[in-house]
């Protein structure tokens, strides 16, 4: 959760931080666990199909800015930071109405719809990737902020934690919180009975069906893990989609074989992947060429020199100070507001 990384950086600078968001999303659990105050308001995304879900999303979006204004009056912040997505929009709009400076964060190489709608009300937009045709005075390319808890622990400890062998290469497979069915099916089919050691984060949807297809002790299949940093530390190569989590691979210096989700808005996952391919840290394949993945996995895991080269490239691409840069900019926005109000 990138907003937590920024909150931690602000806290280290002596700033008081509180969160606001939907009670129906993961932040309602993660934020209090991290020790921050959490205010909730009702908001949901828009369904792309006409019907009850679309009507509910529209109704909540109309009411949400007023709920956010009440939160702002109670908390009286000097600056607002929106972590991106539909939850951030109402709060950024409310901040604009209350004349409080606000900033947004974009995880992908394409400005999403929610951020495009909220962008006119923000003073800053922090980008994980460069995006063409954006006003330089408002946009900052910082990379994706990562919480300290996502930093990888020591390799041997991480492998012990997941029950993986201490010797030999390990492949990490994941497709985001919901998993990636095409990757899940491919890996279980090809490596379920033999192959390299694997840590497979399949997502809760596909996990039950896959358990019957894994036949060996060095293939560790999980629905999800709260210790993603440890999962990265345990592996030598990652097979994944190309969402915002690719920045965590870069920060950990993990070579990647990326299969962008082909139906992502504006093909942003392919754009994300391109950044890391051009930097030398990843290989990208379209989903239509999935049959090449097993061979590439084995080829890479058997080439330690190439893996080391790709790892070094990933570390060069990483932006480990993203949260610190954003925190400094937010503090400057808050200072300007106080100066203007004096």
List each model region and its residues.
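Conserved donor-binding/catalytic loop of nucleotide-activated donor transferases
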Residues: 98, 233-235, 250-259, 279
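Donor-nucleotide binding loops and adjacent catalytic segments primarily
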Residues: 25, 30, 34, 157-160, ...
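C-terminal alpha-helical cap of glycosyltransferases
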Residues: 319-342
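Glycosyltransferases and closely related glycan-assembly transferases
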Residues: 67-80, 88-103, 116-121
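A short, well-ordered alpha-helix in the C-terminal region of glycosyltransferases
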Residues: 306-320
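Active-site-proximal region of nucleotide-activated glycan assembly enzymes
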Residues: 15-16, 26, 37, 96-156
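Conserved nucleotide-sugar phosphate-binding/catalytic loop shared by glycosyltransferases and other
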Residues: 11-63, 67, 142, 204-206, ...
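Acidic donor-binding loop of glycosyltransferase active sites
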Residues: 77-79, 225, 233-247, 254-255
């Amino acid at each position: 959760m990138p907003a937590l990384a920024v909150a931690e950086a602000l806290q280290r600078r002596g700033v008081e931080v509180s969160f606001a968001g939907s009670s129906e999303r993961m932040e309602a659990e993660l934020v209090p666990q991290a020790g921050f105050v959490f205010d909730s308001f009702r908001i949901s995304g828009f369904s792309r199909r006409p019907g009850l879900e679309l009507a509910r999303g529209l109704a909540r979006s109309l009411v949400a800015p007023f709920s956010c204004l009440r939160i702002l009056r109670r908390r009286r912040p000097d600056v607002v930071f929106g972590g991106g997505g539909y939850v951030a929009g109402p709060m950024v709009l409310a901040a604009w109405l209350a004349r409080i400076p606000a900033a947004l964060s974009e995880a992908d190489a394409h400005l999403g719809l929610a951020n495009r709608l909220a962008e006119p009300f923000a003073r800053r937009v922090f980008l994980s990737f460069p995006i063409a045709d954006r006003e330089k005075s408002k946009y900052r390319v910082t990379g994706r902020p990562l919480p300290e808890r996502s930093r990888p622990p020591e390799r041997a400890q991480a492998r012990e934690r997941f029950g993986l062998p201490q010797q030999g290469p390990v492949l990490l497979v994941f497709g985001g919180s919901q998993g990636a069915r095409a990757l899940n099916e491919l890996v279980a089919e090809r490596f379920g009975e033999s192959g390299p050691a694997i840590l497979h984060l399949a997502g809760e949807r596909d996990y039950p069906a896959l358990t019957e297809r894994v036949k060996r002790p060095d293939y560790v299949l999980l629905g999800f893990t709260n210790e993603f940093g440890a999962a990265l530390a345990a592996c030598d190569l990652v097979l994944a989609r190309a969402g915002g989590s690719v920045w965590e691979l870069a920060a950990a210096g993990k070579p990647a074989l990326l299969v962008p989700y082909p139906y992502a808005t504006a093909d942003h996952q392919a754009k994300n992947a391109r950044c890391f391919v051009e930097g030398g840290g990843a290989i990208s394949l379209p989903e239509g060429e999935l049959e090449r993945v097993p061979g590439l996995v084995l080829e890479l895991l058997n080439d330690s020199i190439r893996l080391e080269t790709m790892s070094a490239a990933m570390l060069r691409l990483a932006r480990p100070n993203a949260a610190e840069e954003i925190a400094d900019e937010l503090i400057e926005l808050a200072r300007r507001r106080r100066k203007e109000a004096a």
